[in-house]
Amino acid sequence: VFALEKMGMEAADKIMAVSNLTRNIVINKYGIDPSKVVAVHNAVDFDEFKQMEVKRGVDDKIVTFLGRITYQKGPEYFIEAAYKVLQKCSNVRFVMAGNGDLMNRSIRRVAKLGIADKFHFTGFLRGDDVKKMFAYSDVYIMPSVSEPFGISPLEAMKSNVPSIISKQSGVAEVLSYAIKTDFWDIDAMADAIYGLLNYPALASMSARCGVEEVNNLKWENA
């Protein structure tokens, strides 16, 4: 696959990467001439995006991971951070929404840590179920090991959900009001989650400024 990708990029007149992170990979890993590689950040068309109103059946705060449960998305770091948060506060639940090859391993790890009563696996979500999940959420987290861009944080922030993202993601280049941590730094991740859950002023500012920020991420500005 690498050889085919390299051949295609060498034959191209211009290559559009979805972030500077991806642009650097194309240049450094594939040896492509930097002058023909440009970064054009993704945007989201929110014209038909409507927030959902939901009634919650629990008083606990909800922290959500939404994505494929595979190595690239960093689910294991989410689980370890969840464990650390639950050592300090019990009125929180963690939701892993998605499916993937690390699902069973993640379930086993949650059980081994003794936090299964505070951790929920929804399986794959789409469409209105995704919007509903954001409506339930108090914090969204994307701890990706590597992410060319990442659309889900934009959707979460549009839904007024304070968000935490890994520094190893392309979307980190365009978001100032998402909290950023290294994917491997579960202490920083846990501290960020705890802060957003327990300091209303921080969560409110993050949500309010986040909505304004993603509203300005239009294709004409990409």
Where do the model's predicted regions map?
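Conserved acidic donor-binding segment of nucleotide-sugar-dependent glycosyltransferases
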Residues: A178-D187, G195-P200
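Short alpha-helical donor nucleotide-sugar binding micro-motif in glycosyltransferases
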Residues: F124-L125, K132-S137
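Carbohydrate-associated surface elements
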Residues: L21, A43
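Short hydrophobic beta-strand element within catalytic cores of glycosyltransferases
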Residues: P162-I165
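Membrane-proximal helix-turn-helix segments that form the acceptor-binding/catalytic region
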Residues: F2-I15
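Conserved donor-binding/catalytic core segment of Leloir-type glycosyltransferases
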Residues: M16, G57-A82, V95, A207
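Nucleotide-activated donor-binding/catalytic signature segment of Leloir-type glycosyltransferases, i.e.
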Residues: I107-L125
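Aromatic "clamp/platform" in nucleotide-sugar-dependent glycosyltransferases that forms part
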Residues: V145
